[in-house]
Amino acid sequence: MKISTLVDTNVLIDVWGPAGRQTKWSASVIAACRRDGALIINTIVWSELAPLATEAALRKAVETLKMDRELLPWEAAFLAGIAHSQYRRAGGLRERTLPDFFIGAHAVVAGHRLLTRDAVRYRSYFPDLDIISPETHP
C-alpha cells in the first residue's frame, strides 16, 4: 500500500539549506518516505520556503524530489481555524492562524502522514495525525 507524506518546511530546509545537525536524518527519512509513496508539498510550505531561494531554484528542488504539489483543501482551512482557536484559548499569543495549523490540517484532511521536526505542536492540535519525526523515527 502506498502512503503519501506531506513534508514540513523545516525538513526541506534541512536538505536544501546549509548542512546542519538534522540534515542527515531529514535526507534519509525523505528517501524512506519516497519509497513508501508520494511526497507532498503544499502552498503553505512553498510560501515559507520562498524567502530562501529563487522560484526557479525551488521548482527545480521540488522536481528533483518528485514532489506532488497540492493546494490547501477548504476543509483543512476550517480545521486550521479550529486548531488556532484552541491554541488561543490555551494562552497562545499569535492572533493570526499559524502556518503549522494549515500544514497539519491539510495532512489530516487529505490523509497524508506528516514529516516534521516539530512534532509537539502538531500532536497537541492534531492527535490523530500520523507524524514522522526524530522522536518517532530516530
Name these PLM-found stretches.
Residues 42, 46, 55, 59, ...:
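A general structural signal for well-ordered alpha-helical segments in protein cores
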Residues 3, 68-113, 117:
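Active-site neighborhoods of divalent-metal-dependent phosphate/nucleic-acid chemistry enzymes
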Residues 1-41, 50-61, 132, 138:
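Short, well-structured N-terminal submotif of metal-dependent ribonuclease cores
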Residues 11, 45, 76, 102-103, ...:
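Alpha-helix capping/helix-boundary segments
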Residues 16-19, 47-48, 90-94:
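Short, flexible loop segments at the rims of nucleotide/cofactor-binding pockets, characterized by
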Residues 53-77:
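Active-site-proximal, substrate-binding regions of enzyme catalytic domains
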Residues 122-127:
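Short loop/helix-cap segments at secondary-structure boundaries that form the rim of catalytic
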Residues 70-73, 131-135:
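Short acidic-hydrophobic, aromatic-tinged amphipathic segments that line or gate anion-handling sites
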